[in-house]
Swiss-Prot record:
Belongs to the tubulin--tyrosine ligase family. Mg(2+) 2 binds at E361, N363. This is Probable tubulin polyglutamylase TTLL9. GO terms for biological process: flagellated sperm motility; microtubule cytoskeleton organization; protein modification process. Residues 1-21, 182-208 are annotated as: Disordered.
Length: 461
């Protein structure tokens, strides 16, 4: 159980074994009234706890975590949906700092070739503290396009593109050091799921609120891969159960998010051309939710294979695997790896014309609000499989390489796709145990998995 530390603590969460066995239900709590609530309420043996009731499982928002984590006692069995300092990866400026540091570390320890595997994020400067470094870089490469992003906002708010130094000078005079209002830092409210429930918090990815607004200035990818003349990015889901040792799962499904307007560099002020966020696109005058602003990753992978062949697609998706692992390794030593914590990250990836993937950002609270029935089904399955891996029911053995739509890609080292394969990625025909954009026969896999686990329980050792 969990309980605030400042209350009269009498061993909550450390009940005797017999008492624990008698309590069959798992008490959950969440502040998110979206697809997640639907999944939690329909999970057998799980009961909702409201207000200050004691809980075993809490899918919280990042604001609750910041205000309460350090003051809450959690028993051995309790699980919570964020790592304490998740922002080391999910704040844009911290993510870049950690990746730059990790790249330098790799260059010292393993050489430039290994360090080059971290070259998957555009040249970036934190503003205003690296303003003079940015100006120096800007003058070396005049005429290119840059994109300015606030480090702690979501839904495309505060983002703008520029090519003139005057634009950034005006920004520095008028915006640097501006304090965020609570309204600016929080997502929109009162959206509705296909299930009919209202989402009061996460209509899009939640971000940390910070007292002073910082930005990152990032070199804009001017040659994005286009489909039908439109720009898109990919949303991919990675589940981390532990940082020490690093244990990470990759979900097979995800989606491509398209802009509503054909791409051009002639109108850098048009957000409908350059920003693919659903929150931005749905404000477009000609937006229609059924027009095709999202593709499932399986469709996207098939499209690329038909255009470029399966070998090129395998290389692209292998490069994305590298992004997931290297980014997690970059924060492995700074994230507080509390055994009570897990995290479902939403990775945003951009593909350029050379089929090179670029990491745009990592979201600590990827939107769980559905924009269509297909989106609702994806997120429902994603959350169900996340709960299977968190395993509050203690059904798994810990040796599983696949659970539903999740594949174990890293377990204190790379995981081989084939049984009996080598343990080191530099050996032989090693193929990482990932299947992003492949067939997701999760229902059949779960049926076989739990039947096998049930059989193991019945068989005496």
């Amino acid at each position: 159980m969990s309980r605030p530390k400042n209350q009269n603590y009498k061993g909550h969460g450390l009940q005797k074994g017999k008492e624990r066995e008698q309590r069959a239900s798992i008490r959950f709590k969440t502040t998110l009234m979206n697809t997640l609530m639907d999944v939690l309420r329909h999970r057998p043996g799980w009961v909702e706890v409201k207000d200050e009731g004691e809980w075993d499982f809490y899918w919280c928002d990042v604001s609750w975590l910041r205000e309460n984590f350090d003051h809450t006692y959690m028993g051995e069995h309790v699980r919570i949906s964020h790592f304490r300092n998740h922002y080391e990866l999910t704040r844009k400026n911290y993510m870049v700092k950690n990746l730059k540091r990790f790249r330098k570390q790799l260059e010292r320890e393993a050489g430039k070739l290994e360090a080059a595997k971290c070259d998957f994020f555009p040249k970036t400067f934190e503003m205003p503290c690296e303003y003079h470094l940015f100006v120096e870089e800007f003058r070396k490469n005049p005429g290119i396009t840059w994109i300015m992003k606030p480090v702690a906002r979501s839904q495309g708010k505060g983002i703008f593109l520029f090519r003139r130094l005057k634009d950034i000078m005006d920004w520095k005079k008028g915006t640097a050091g501006k304090k965020l209002t609570s309204l600016e830092a929080q997502p929109a409210r009162n959206t509705v799921n296909p299930s009919g429930s209202h989402d009061t918090r996460s209509s899009d990815d939640q971000k940390d609120e910070i007292p002073v607004e910082n930005y990152v200035a990032q070199r804009y990818i001017e040659n994005p891969y286009l489909i039908g003349g439109r720009k898109f990015d990919l949303r991919v889901y990675v589940l981390v159960m532990s940082y020490i040792p690093l244990r990470a799962w990759l979900y097979r499904d995800g989606f491509a998010r398209f802009s509503n307007t054909r791409f051009t560099l002639n109108s850098i002020d048009d957000q409908y051309v350059h920003l693919t966020n659903v929150a931005v696109q749905k404000t477009s005058p000609d937006y229609h939710p059924k027009k095709g602003c999202k593709w499932m990753l399986q469709r996207f992978r098939q499209y690329l294979a038909s255009k470029h062949g399966p070998e090129a697609v395998e290389t692209l998706f292998s490069d994305m695997d590298n992004i997931f692992i290297r980014s997690l390794q970059s924060v492995q030593k700074v994230i507080i790896s509390d055994k009570h914590c897990f995290e479902l990250y939403g990775y945003d990836i951009l593909i350029d014309q050379d089929l090179k993937p670029w990491l745009l950002e990592v979201n600590a609270s990827p939107s769980l609000t559905a924009s269509s029935q297909e989106d609702y089904e994806l997120k429902t399955c994603l959350l169900e499989d996340t709960l299977h891996i968190v395993d509050m029911e203690a059904r798994l053995t810990g040796r599983e390489k696949r659970v539903g739509g999740f594949d174990l890609m890293w377990n204190d080292g790379p995981v081989s796709r084939e049984e009996g394969g080598p343990d080191l990625s530099g050996m032989g025909n090693f193929v990482t145990n990932t299947h992003l954009g492949c067939v997701n026969d999760r229902k059949e896999q779960l049926r076989q998995l739990f039947r096998s686990l049930q059989g193991q329980k019945k068989t005496p050792n």
